[in-house]
Amino acid sequence: MNSLTAKVNTFDINLSSDFKMSSNHLKLLELDKLFSGIKLSENFKNNFINNLDNENKHNIDFKNYVGLSYQNSKYKISLSFTDRIYTSYNLKKDFFEFVFFGNSRSISDTLNLNNSYFSALKYQQIKFGFSHSFKNYQVGYKIGYLIGNNLINSNIENATLYTSQNITNILMDYNVSSTYSNEFSSSFFRRNGNGISVDLNFLKKTKSKAYKIQILDFGFVKWLDNNNNYSDSNFVYSGIEITDDINISDTNFLSSTNLDKFNSESNTYSFLPTQISFVIDSESKIQFIRSNKIGFNFLWYPTKFYEKISDIKFKDGMYKNGFAPQIYTESIIDLNYFLFSPILSYGGFSDNLNIGTKLTFGKSNSFCIGSYNLESLLQQSESNNVSIYLQLKLSL
């Protein structure tokens, strides 16, 4: 069967699980030590900071999916349920300097924490979709209802920390906003918010190629009134005689200060990470290669929360989220007993070239297992990226 020709009159059941962890700085060995609970050595902290970039990015995306679909020659309808955990950050090198050493190594110097963020989001999504096929075109959309479970968001617009030579003056000039949902739970359907999402796709077919544009998960969650919102700015600590260097992370120091925080009881909106894709799928002239694909992925993800939905600006989702435009290629090779799909990608949250593969067993009923980061098997604890993909498809 032509790889670009869809089946008709089929009812499919899809089950999938997709886990991706990507970083441009954090290795698995370092991650294990950071969360092991053991005391970090000075040597570890120094080596960790010396290997950092100016911008340090990390992302975890874990999705479990169940979908039903019916398709004939004219249209396709679908119903699906997704549970998703999405965390990401983009932090300056000085942020980790501050966390590990406080201000003890920045006397007469300024630490710069500008344009940093941390975000963690968990939600469920129920989608209904419909697509219509014309002669050489296919147009589709999906409408989703969102159940917001948990949200943690901290956004640093501007932040500097200056410590004077004799440590009698500490100047913190910053603009920080944070929010978190009041009740945390890992259980399904813990409703701390509600929202909607939209998917759009457009497909154009020619004799040997298909061109596809997709917008996935454009939407937002309105969190319930029990969210805790905080903002703060501009703090000066001065006029006290100090006889020894102060570590700003010392709990006694922090407890003796009084930072003004402003609690907001207004609405809280957060947006989903929205994927925008452009894909060209071409038939292969080589007998055992079904098709070759090249694609471009972009991420629109505002890293802060909003009190009004009208406050959002398109540029908010294009910068600071740490995702670089990604290009990838994928081929489908028929080896009789299974399909072998090598994948090459560059961009995203990683600065490296990533090598992946998918293995698909079966035809109408199939099982697929794959990874976007086979290099992690060779690098093991030194790897920055880990991923695994599982899919079970049943056609009736």
Residue ranges and their predicted role:
Residues 4-188, 224-256, 309-317, 367-372, ...:
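A subset of solvent-exposed loop/turn segments in beta-rich extracellular surface proteins, enriched
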Residues 9-17, 75-79, 137-143, 198, ...:
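Transmembrane beta-strands of outer-membrane beta-barrel proteins
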Residues 17-23, 81-87, 145-151, 197, ...:
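Transmembrane beta-strands of outer-membrane beta-barrel pores
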Residues 49-53, 187, 290-317, 331-350, ...:
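Transmembrane beta-strand segments that form the barrel wall of outer-membrane beta-barrel proteins
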Residues 52-60, 116-122, 188-194, 268-274, ...:
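Short sequence motifs at beta-strands and strand-loop junctions characteristic
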Residues 63-67, 125-129, 197-201, 277-279, ...:
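Membrane-embedded beta-strand positions in outer-membrane beta-barrel channels/transporters
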Residues 69-72, 81, 132-134, 202-206, ...:
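Residue-level signature of outer-membrane beta-barrel architecture
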Residues 384-396:
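Outer-membrane beta-barrel "beta-signal"
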